[in-house]
From Swiss-Prot:
It is found in: Cytoplasm. Specifically methylates the N4 position of cytidine in position 1402 (C1402) of 16S rRNA. The gene is rsmH. It is an enzyme of class 2 (transferase). NCBIfam families: 16S rRNA (cytosine(1402)-N(4))-methyltransferase RsmH (TIGR00006). GO terms for biological process: rRNA base methylation. This is Ribosomal RNA small subunit methyltransferase H. PANTHER family: 12S RRNA N4-METHYLCYTIDINE METHYLTRANSFERASE, S-ADENOSYL-METHYLTRANSFERASE MRAW. It catalyses: cytidine(1402) in 16S rRNA + S-adenosyl-L-methionine = N(4)-methylcytidine(1402) in 16S rRNA + S-adenosyl-L-homocysteine + H(+). S-adenosyl-L-methionine binds at G33, G34, H35, D53, F79, D100, Q107. Disulfide bonds: none annotated. Its EC number is 2.1.1.199. The lineage of its organism: Bacteria, Bacillati, Bacillota, Clostridia, Eubacteriales. InterPro entries: RsmH (IPR002903), SAM-dep_MeTrfase_MraW_recog (IPR023397), SAM-dependent_MTases_sf (IPR029063). Its main location: cytoplasm.
Length: 309
């Protein structure tokens, strides 16, 4: 199957990196290779791109798509390990990092992966197929309190309690094994009058996917480690797709811009912690109306950029 994916905020993201022809860059989420391709076009033979993805399908597809470029290194891993990856490649510092945190169109459209609430598929949702924890285990083995917590915290779902109750009740009769089975349970749990805005299963599926792939735990560490490996003037550009991710990135960038831990009423800083980055855009960059009409999946995307100082 072709790895179809339209990269969002492509021009804005690439422009934000201020790419140097001989620079070293990291695409932490290779996907269909859209961002990587645009970076490679701007690099000379002396430049280098490290392309990371935990989905081997993305690696295989992009290796074919980008086969004419010789200055790209593919890494089948999670960008959580960015520091170790760079260490093993004997790369001390890089000039730019991209993280596109969205699920690719390929992963949504490929029925077998279980990411989509629009297609029937086994409950899976693993970005890395070698991982042991899948959506099936979460839905069928987590207790009601655990389910409620992840649906509430990761999905920001107002009906997390009802949904978790309905899931537990349904699985007492037989295991919940497919995506559309789960969708049916969620629809029963949410009162009809509250199902008018967006798909009723969207937030719960988001929550389960985040739990399966440990996305928020990965994100916090990866941003910190990524920034630590930037050259002075190097930039990190991060595209988020839901408010929870965006708040984490906004908060992380603020902390890196002002890491001082001194009490607010202290006249001078005595903790010695200096700013690590400067935030390039105080407000996130969002897609144009034109992009949203061409690619509806870009609607919720936001781009935040920070520069190492």
């Amino acid at each position: 199957m072709e790895f179809k994916h339209i990269p969002v905020l492509l021009k804005e993201t690439i422009d934000s990196l201020n790419i140097k022809q001989d620079g070293v860059y990291v695409d932490c989420t290779l996907g269909g290779g859209g961002h990587s391709l645009e970076i490679l076009k701007r690099l000379s033979d002396k430049g280098k791109l490290i392309a990371i993805d935990q989905d081997i399908s993305a690696i295989n597809w992009s290796e074919e798509r980008l086969k004419n470029f010789k200055n790209i290194i593919y890494v089948h891993d999670n960008f959580y390990n960015i520091q170790q990856i760079l260490k093993e490649l004997k790369i001390d510092k890089v000039d730019g990092i991209i993280m596109d945190l969205g699920v690719s169109s390929y992963q949504l459209d490929e029925g077998k992966r279980g990411f989509s609430y629009m297609k029937d598929a086994p409950l899976d949702m693993r970005m890395n197929r070698d991982s042991s924890l899948s959506a099936y285990e979460i839905v069928n083995q987590y207790n009601e309190e655990e389910l409620c917590r992840i649906i509430r915290d990761y999905g920001e779902e107002n009906f997390s309690r009802r949904i978790s109750k309905f899931i537990v009740k349904a699985r007492e009769e037989s295991p919940i094994s497919t995506t559309l089975q789960l969708v049916g349970i969620i629809k029963k749990a949410i009162p009809l009058k509250f199902q008018k805005e967006g798909h009723p299963a969207k937030r719960t599926f988001q929550a389960i996917r985040i739990e399966v792939n440990e996305e928020l735990k990965i994100l916090d560490k990866a941003v910190e480690d990524g920034v630590a490996n930037l050259n002075t003037g190097g930039r990190i550009a991060i595209i988020t797709f839901h408010s929870l991710e965006d708040r984490i990135i906004k908060s992380k960038f603020k902390m890196l811009e002002n890491p001082c831990t001194c009490p607010a009423d202290f006249p001078i800083c005595i903790c010695g912690k200096k700013p690590i980055v400067k935030i390039v855009n105080k407000k996130p960059i969002v897609p144009t109306e034109e992009e949203k009409s061409i690619n509806p999946r870009s609607k919720s995307s936001k781009l935040r950029i920070a520069e190492r100082i």
